[in-house]
């Protein structure tokens, strides 16, 4: 992959802030948008290792707000970076009457306005066929890990780091790493990138398995309903093994009450689990 790295890289210094302009905005659903930001030139790539994410920084109400996002575009894309983001509006969630600071800021951005990007950030690096590097913390050196089957538990916009990996692995004919995903959402309308996930599952049936669970399923729903359970994990994800790695990303309740306790109950050890 690196032999063709002639393109200029945007994220040269992980501590620097790079102002990037909003060049396109697409409404994906009632509360989800795709934001496209322009890179310094049409030839630039972002320069983000697979497994890593970026931070967006903005001054909102005199306060510096920093949020982490995994782009859905990759370094095969030149001149732009795409983010899929769920907007947390005011007065929707009783616990968060103010809504999301950063997401509402993005929602109100006009084409041509800029926001600061910083990165790469992250503890997981995917180096190619089943080879991963995992940092125990942000500053340590990555520890080599080999996996032939990646299990994935994602909730809501926690799908973006999974999509980054799924796309990268299925695009590489030499990579036979298997992936199984449980994707949890509130309603059927909330399922992000559904079309793409189902297309990948259809074209790579031996490599990618897809399963959904919904809090409020429609009548006749053929997948699971409710929280991610131990039975669901047992049925749809690879069993505990040295060559199994389970990736988890989503809201805190999914991680703390559904994913981690059930994985531990089923005998997955700490080194078999990575939480974004």
Swiss-Prot record:
It comes from the Eukaryota. FAD binds at residues 107-137, 146-181. Gene3D superfamilies: Nucleotide-binding domain of ferredoxin-NADP reductase (FNR) module, Translation factors. CDD domains: cyt_b5_reduct_like. The modification N6-acetyllysine is found at residue 17. One of its GO terms (cellular component) is membrane. Its EC number is 1.6.2.2. The modification Phosphotyrosine is found at residue 18. Restricted expression. It catalyses: 2 Fe(III)-[cytochrome b5] + NADH = 2 Fe(II)-[cytochrome b5] + NAD(+) + H(+). Its cofactor is FAD. Transmembrane segments: none annotated. One of its GO terms (molecular function) is FAD binding. Keywords: Acetylation, FAD, Flavoprotein, Lipid biosynthesis, Lipid metabolism, NAD, Oxidoreductase, Phosphoprotein, Steroid biosynthesis, Steroid metabolism, Sterol biosynthesis, Sterol metabolism. InterPro entries: CBR-like, Cbr1-like_FAD-bd_dom, FAD-bd_FR_type, Flavoprot_Pyr_Nucl_cyt_Rdtase, FNR_nucleotide-bd, OxRdtase_FAD/NAD-bd, Riboflavin_synthase-like_b-brl. GO terms for biological process: bicarbonate transport; sterol biosynthetic process. Residues 15-127 form the FAD-binding FR-type domain. It is an enzyme of class 1 (oxidoreductase). Belongs to the flavoprotein pyridine nucleotide cytochrome reductase family. NADH-cytochrome b5 reductases are involved in desaturation and elongation of fatty acids, cholesterol biosynthesis, drug metabolism, and, in erythrocyte, methemoglobin reduction. Responsible for NADH-dependent lucigenin chemiluminescence in spermatozoa by reducing both lucigenin and 2-[4-iodophenyl]-3-[4-nitrophenyl]-5-[2,4-disulfophenyl]-2H tetrazolium monosodium salt (WST-1). This is NADH-cytochrome b5 reductase 2. It comes from Homo sapiens.
